[in-house]
Amino acid sequence: FTDIADFVIMDEDGSVSIPVEGGTRMTENLVGAHFPEYDGFLVLSHFKGHAIAGFGGAIKNISIGMASQEGKCLIHTDGASHTSPWGGAQDPFLECMAEAGKSVQDSLNGNILYINVLNRLSVDCDCDSSPAEPDMHDIGILASTDPVAIDQASVDLIYEAEDGASLVERMESRNAEHVLQHGEEIGLGNRSYDLVSID
């Protein structure tokens, strides 16, 4: 990919702290040290299942995806560890993801466009070393300026799909929609949306 464009490893030079406003679990989020160099992002997410979060989409990418190594550990452990990502309780982890995402969005004054690609829909994340093969059809591509709305629409389309049972089970068994509920409660976005089809 370096033949296509230059790239930056956001946390290759460590972490920088950004504030979490209105959170119930976090007061700061640790993102990559290069984060302040940007005034906006296009967040392209392959929507899919996830072994811990239930699903991964826009919110996961602006929280876990933007976090430094230390920040990832803080999100996963409800602030208990800077060095290990394991051992946190499920709902607090989901709430920390929403709050970390809000800190990123607030720091950029909402200057983010989100695109979720709903294809090759597996119960597992691309970060899994041996993910399950997709077992449902491709759905399409969504775009929004609201990370909660785009992830809610993505979840709803999975529920509407005739072949979405395995991904629905993955989401429900992880209480995945809690990240959307908490995200809406803290002002990250809105679960209500209008789905406009563009052919």
Identify the residue ranges that each predicted region occupies.
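Extended, low-polarity segments enriched in aliphatic/aromatic residues
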Residues: F1-D199
